[in-house]
């Protein structure tokens, strides 16, 4: 059996954040990642995905290693939202880095729905600043009257509104709606060893490292000599000793037939809300027959997704979208609306981006018959359309959960089954989002609009709540630092800890929680 001081399951933005901080404290860390290596900087992926529209199978796991079953309202391919590579999902994210509101941490006390977190915004606020510094966030609150208080400035200045966003901001202002800039982990100027953004407009696959990728800090953790990464390695279960302490993890190389054990003083599970839940359920034993951390029955329960409903607006004039890099404009005016409690909060999100696959495939002409002229016609038509997204919070419910599937992977371990049915408050939030879409359409002078139906939403790859934090076994899986109740050296950290999702993108909160937990470990356990 091999050993280390700390073992981390998952190399995504949470696991990497913790590995980087621990390694720089002189602590030995072993990181186990189910997926393959993912080169950094991502210039190779840029050439493949953007220039050649090639989805390289070398960066995908086969179905007998990455799969889930799904039932309920969610009509998207939830499995494809889990990017299992070294670096995780934040290797291909949009880098939107937003703070939750203080109100988001106490929706039960303030509005009568959901549950309150065991910590407050003020407890997390200093760590939001540390997370922004780590990721190199460009932003300002000067144009956003709805931003929560902060004790430290953004490390980089904001990206100005794009040409089309500036036009919309003025039209919306005249109708009482504030459009402001978007904080994002994309470098407005050179930052540390990362160059300033060159506005390629392909933020999900940034070839130069201007858009933050966890691999940036994972490489630096490895350079300390204190961090080692095991790619293409599945962690199959966790082992707890007779005293209740986590003793080891059982892992297996994806191409090998024999499992092995790795012992550690502290084990951290940071594999995303879905896969972290699966690992706890697979770790059932005589001591924990329903799964590790599941003595109160909360593992896999309280699942929430963000509900993103997309719309398009058509105008007589040309707005020239796609001329200014990534996202620049949004409105947080409706994050904490007057009737919150009757419905949830909503982010009004504008996108000025154009994607290669939208241009090439945004036509009914068979692919083999497309000409350059047909592609130009598609581009011309796109100049008169603007995309808009209503990104909404959701609430936990009895029909939102993760459990073991009846189907099994190549090792014989059950896959996940995800059940997701919207709650009554979710449906009311859709109606509120639709009203906002109609307001924006009228205020900006659109002559046509299209908006998704209530069931046609995407999660934004935001999966939360399945190992939520709380005060004890009766209401949660972990405490406010991610430590599993009753298992003093086992932590689950990430979006799975969220008690409620709010409406803003969760990544900055996840990183802030990771930094806070790492400091707790160094002070108390290591």
Where are each of the predicted segments found?
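N-terminal Rossmann-like FAD-binding beta1-loop-alpha1 element of flavoenzymes
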Residues: 4-30
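Residue-level detector of alpha-helix initiation sites
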Residues: 12-13, 274, 497
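Glycine-rich loop(s) and the adjacent beta-strand/alpha-helix scaffold that form part
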Residues: 24, 31, 35-46, 224, ...
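Redox-cofactor-proximal catalytic regions of oxidoreductases
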Residues: 51-144, 398
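Conserved redox-cofactor binding core of oxidoreductases
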Residues: 61, 69-70, 110-234, 458-459
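FAD cofactor-binding and catalytic pocket of flavoenzymes
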Residues: 68-82, 86-89, 117-118, 296-416, ...
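A glycine-rich dinucleotide-binding beta-alpha-beta segment and adjacent secondary-structure elements
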Residues: 181-185, 196-202, 236-240, 383-394, ...
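A conserved FAD-binding loop/helix module that cradles the flavin
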Residues: 500-519
